[in-house]
Amino acid sequence: MGYSPSDVVKLIQEKDIKFIDFRFTDTKGKEQHVSVPGHVIEEDTFTEGKAFDGSSIAGWKGINESDMILLPDPDSAVLDPFMDETTLLLRCDVIEPATGQGYERDPRSVAKRAEIYLKSTGIADTSFFGPEFFVFDSVTWNIDMSGCAYKVDAEEAAWNSGKEYESGNMGHRLGVKGGYFPVPPVDSAQDLRSAMCLAMEEMGLKVEVHHHEVATAGQHEIGVGFNTLTPRRMRCKILKYVVHNVAAVRQTATFMPKPVVGDNGSGMHVHQSLGKDGKNIFAGDLYGGLSEIALYYIGGIIKHAKAVNALTNPSTNSYKRLVPHFEAPVLLAYSAKNRSASIRIPYVNSPKARRIEVRFPDSTANPYLAFSAMLMAGLDGIQNKIHPATAMDKNLYDLPAEEQANIPGVAASLEEALRALEADHDFLMKGGVFSESWLEGYLDVKWAEVQTLRVTTHPVEFQMYYSL
């Protein structure tokens, strides 16, 4: 990328770009957009921005103070491969007109403040993330006064092994927890994932790997390579956009953590490391080849994990994944290579690649907020020398109950995570990265989600209680 405003204007002219799509991210992490004709974009657009109504975005402005500005980032310019008309995407900061500064509740502005705070420490941040997702052939749901229900289906799902198809049932299906990772024809989505990866590469991402994941019914993972803080979050948005749109040709993709009952859920494993003066300061001669700084970083994440869960696992559905027996990282421990721990130290060939993998996040997270929160927790651990105690090299899933009781766990529900965030958020406020205004708006949005589920009768309640 590396575009300047003049580069973007030149690109619009050279490529005869018809439309510019201004994109920004709301509190929940969903991208929003507004399009303008390409010919109206001038260099001044990148300093003056475009006005919009902020009162329509949940958790933001009231109608009495709704004017806001979208300020496009020229360095984010990328052609959209899915639009019929030639369209250039520009991701935007949301600006407060009264101050000319990034809006306190704008997730992208939060991420930029985190980057500024990180630079003030003289440290750099890199990461690799691997989101998991499902691709279904169909999905339906219904919620009204007469009842509620949902239904997902995928031809490759284990439950379709006895289904009659017009062209015949060819078998070759994945069993429950059997998706990791046989070759085609059992893996029926090799070409689909390849098409996704090619589109991601076209949009500037560096794809590291793709494969079928553990669950039946079309669970997959695509890993995207290391990069610095703000571009990483932008790449996460591109990845989700590509997955949704490539799948939408004939199917439907979801990043919900637990759309299928009885099989593994989908996470977003985030690999992180810190560097200073060109050196990886996570590399050392302590446990797992880590430095003392890396251990303190882990200690900060473990200490603040339940509050961080409110941002890394911000949906009620997140906690249907974070339960025992489905390879979910529910215990706050760290270990070299051990995937049952919530923080893993992967094997690497060189100390330059030394990193940690935080395994509890999922892709309902707003990446601008989630990655910033993990960073702030880790930096707090370094600043306060929070040691994470002894590493756990045992299979944590097989520990007796009395041993498990001595290991802290992630939040068990969104409600618990929000309570933790209410009580433990000072580490987020350092350097003005997050603010009390942001916290108020975020909690309003998320408590409303908790309340929606709380007052909605669930079908399984009929199974448990109808005949009592």
Swiss-Prot record:
Domain (GS beta-grasp) ranges: 15-100
ATP-binding as UniProt keyword: yes
SUPFAM superfamilies in the record: Glutamine synthetase, N-terminal domain (SSF54368), Glutamine synthetase/guanido kinase (SSF55931)
Domain GS catalytic: 107-468
EC number: 6.3.1.2
Name listed for the protein in its UniProt record: Glutamine synthetase
Pfam families assigned: Gln-synt_C, Gln-synt_N
Subunit relationships: Oligomer of 12 subunits arranged in the form of two hexameric ring.
Stored PANTHER family: GLUTAMINE SYNTHETASE
Listed cofactors: Mg(2+)
Protein residues bound to ATP: 208, 271-273, 339, 344, 352
Entry binding sites for Mg(2+) 2: 132, 213, 221
Activity regulation behaviour: The activity of this enzyme could be controlled by adenylation under conditions of abundant glutamine.
One GO term of the biological process aspect: glutamine biosynthetic process
Binding locations of Mg(2+) 1: 269, 357
Entries under SMART domains matching the protein: Gln-synt_C
Residues found modified as O-AMP-tyrosine: 397
